[in-house]
A protein has these predicted regions:
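Glycine-rich "HGGG/HGxG" loop immediately N-terminal to the catalytic nucleophile
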Residues: 43, 63-79, 135
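Conserved hydrolase catalytic core segment
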Residues: 96-136
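Conserved acidic catalytic loop of the alpha/beta-hydrolase fold
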Residues: 81-98
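Catalytic histidine-centered segment of alpha/beta-hydrolase-like enzymes
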Residues: 258-267, 271
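Alpha/beta-hydrolase fold catalytic core
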Residues: 1-32, 54-56, 95-96, 248, ...
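Helix-rich cap/lid subdomain of alpha/beta-hydrolase
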Residues: 132-194
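Conserved HGGG/HGGXW glycine-rich cap/lid loop of the alpha/beta-hydrolase fold
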Residues: 17-68
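Conserved serine/cysteine hydrolase catalytic core
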Residues: 185-245, 251
Length: 279
C-alpha cells in the first residue's frame, strides 16, 4: 500500500524506559492505540494505520524491547510490565476512553489491560490470540526464535531466511516487517533490533509463566471484536468461541487467506472487517 501519509516519530518516558511510538495525526478524532506482537513493532501496523488515520487518531506503540523503544534493563518482559507501560503511556498522553487493538502478545497485553482497567476503553480489538494458545503455533514461534541466527551478512540474507517462514504476506510487506526488525551491527553485519534477552529466554527455557487471562475476560465491559485468521495455528476455533461466550459484548470475525499475521497476510479484508465493526 503506497501513501503520502507519514507518521510522526515521538517518544515518552514510562517506568524509566524511553518508549517510541508513531503518531499518525488526526488529533481530536477518537484515539486508537495499536500494540504489536512478540517480534513486531509499531510499523507492523502501517497498512492499518494508513487506512484508519483519516477517521481516528492512531498511535502505534513500540512496546519495551522492540523497535526504537528502550530494552528493559532487568529483562522484565512479563504481561504485567507491558500493562504498566501502557498505563503510563495513557497517563502521559492523557488518554481516556480510547480504542485499543492488540495482536498476538499485544493482544494478550490488551486483554490484561482491558480486564483491569475497563473504564478506560471505548472499544477493544483482539487479533488472533486468546488466553490459551494452540500448542502448534506457540511451539512453532518458540522454535523459530530459538533457531534464528543472531546476525546475517546482508539484509537480503535476512529476507531469504525469513521468507521460508512466510506463508501469506507479500514480499513488500515482508521486507517492511524486516526493515524495522533489523539494524546494522558495529561489525557491518545485520542483526535484530529487538532485545536479545527475549530470544535468550526462549533458548534457555526461562520465559516467565504466562498470566491466566480467563478470569479477567468477564471484566471486559466495552464492545470487543475478536479477529481470527482462518489459517492460523495460534487461536483455535474452540478458544475463539469460548472468548465470545466469556467477554460480554464481543463478536468474532474470521479473515480468509490469513494466518496468524492477519493484517499483514490479508490487509484488505482485515481493514474491511475492522471498519465494518467500528461503524
Amino acid at each position: 500500500m503506497t501513501t503520502q501519509v507519514q507518521p510522526k516519530d515521538k517518544t515518552v518516558t514510562v517506568n524509566g524506559l524511553k518508549l517510541h511510538y508513531l503518531d499518525w495525526g488526526s488529533e481530536g478524532s477518537p484515539v486508537m492505540v495499536l500494540l504489536h506482537g512478540l517480534r513486531g513493532h509499531a510499523h507492523s501496523w502501517d497498512d492499518v494505520s494508513v487506512a484508519m488515520c483519516q477517521d481516528y487518531h492512531v498511535l502505534a506503540l513500540d512496546q519495551r524491547g522492540r523497535g526504537d523503544s528502550d530494552w528493559a534493563k532487568d529483562g522484565d518482559y512479563t504481561t504485567s510490565a507491558y500493562v504498566s507501560d501502557l498505563l503510563g503511556f495513557c497517563d502521559a498522553l492523557k488518554l481516556d476512553k480510547f480504542i485499543l487493538m492488540g495482536h498476538s502478545m499485544g493482544g494478550r497485553n490488551s486483554m490484561s489491560f482491558a480486564g483491569r482497567h475497563p473504564q478506560q476503553l471505548e472499544k477493544l480489538v483482539i487479533v488472533d490470540v486468546g488466553p490459551t494458545l494452540d500448542s502448534r503455533g506457540s511451539e512453532r514461534i518458540s522454535q523459530e526464535i530459538r533457531q534464528v541466527p543472531e546476525e546475517f551478512d546482508s539484509f537480503e540474507a535476512v529476507v531469504e531466511y525469513m521468507s521460508k517462514q512466510n506463508r501469506f504476506a507479500s514480499d513488500a510487506v515482508l521486507r517492511r516487517r524486516l526493515q524495522y526488525s533489523t539494524k546494522e551491527l558495529p561489525n557491518g553485519k545485520i542483526g535484530w533490533r529487538y532485545d536479545v534477552a527475549i530470544r535468550e529466554q526462549r533458548r534457555q527455557g526461562t520465559v516467565p509463566p504466562s498470566e491466566d487471562l480467563w478470569p479477567l475476560l468477564p471484566n471486559i465491559t466495552c464492545p470487543t471484536l475478536i479477529v481470527r485468521g482462518k489459517e492460523t495455528d495460534i487461536l483455535s476455533p474452540e478458544v475463539a468461541q469460548k472468548m465470545t461466550e466469556t467477554i460480554p459484548a464481543s463478536q468474532l470475525v474470521e479473515v480468509e487467506r490469513a494466518g496468524h499475521m492477519v493484517f499483514e497476510d490479508n490487509p484488505g479484508d482485515f481493514i474491511a472487517a475492522l471498519k465494518g465493526w467500528l461503524s
